[in-house]
Amino acid sequence: MHSNRPKATSDTSTIVRLYGALLVIAITVGALVTAVALRDKEIQDWRHHLGSMSYMLTEHTAQTVFSAFLVLDAITEQVRQMDVQDEAAFRQRLSTVEMHQLLRDKIQGLSQLDVASIVAANGDNINFSRAHPVPRINLAERDYFKAHRDQPHLGDHISTAVRNKGNGKWTFYVSRRLDDAQGRFLGLVLVGLSVDAFTGVYGRLIETLGDGASISLYRGDLTMLARAPHQDDLIGRVNRSGTTHRVITEQGAQDAVVLTDTPRFSDGIGNLRLIAVRKAMRYPLVVSLVVPDTIFLASW
């Protein structure tokens, strides 16, 4: 009679090897699932962190712009109290050294404010905070001048960023139209905000985040006003293709934190990154904070 022991032993060995292989697979799958879960948690933690950071950053930006509007209010009220009713009187009374001193006093101690100006109906800068008498400067080609001249009921306006004609620095302006009693255009009051003031604050923040991070400030129509790191060729451009455009314009969201690898507005390159986008509550401004995966997945 033949013995079945060798076959039984062989079957047992096969089963042991099979169970061993299954155990290895189970451990590997478990490790992968755990790794994915931990990676997802890391991303979620960063989403929350960037959402909070974008809120604080947007509030700081709004407070900075608020200071410019306070100055705009004060200067406008001073001009209205003069009850100027024609262009000749406007030029005569608002071009004085006393008005120059008032403009200087209003922005003194506010380093984020670059200049305060009075502009006549033809675009001539008839007084400003930097010097008196004012050098010959005409601003008729600027977007804010055309907007107020052509739209009597525009209200307050935030301009695109331009090179200031007085000192050559990047500046954007809050402005208000001045009319006579009949509603005829007399001129403008301008308060200029230094782009450097924003890039300085933004730059210090991205230093704490790491290489590859960036912060952008846009006007409501997504015209770029400021960016850190600064790029001259991006200032004044309108974002019509990036994630910020999709969140704000296409989706109509107030804020969002998005994980994406679509091409960037800044250079067209697609890399994995988190983008925290937020609209300011009081002003037509949008802040966008970008962090690449080399930062938020640095431990992976």
Predicted features by range, described:
Residues A8-Y19, L23-A89, Q108-Q112:
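Juxtamembrane extracytoplasmic/periplasmic/luminal helical "stalk" adjacent to the first N-terminal
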Residues A8-S10, T199-L205, V291-W300:
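Membrane-interface helix-start motif
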Residues N239-W300:
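Extracellular/periplasmic juxtamembrane segments that couple receptor/chemosensory ectodomains to their
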Residues T58, A62, R142-K146, G192, ...:
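Amphipathic alpha-helical bundle/coiled-coil segments
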Residues I43, R47, G51, F69, ...:
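Short, structured helix-loop boundary elements
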Residues I107-D114, A121-G200, R204-D211, A256, ...:
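Extracytoplasmic/periplasmic ligand-binding sensor regions of membrane-associated signaling proteins
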Residues M1-T9, R47-H49, G155-S159:
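N-terminal sensory and localization modules of signal-transduction and trafficking proteins
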Residues A74-V79, T96-R130, R142, K146, ...:
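Extracytoplasmic ligand-binding sensor domains of the Cache superfamily
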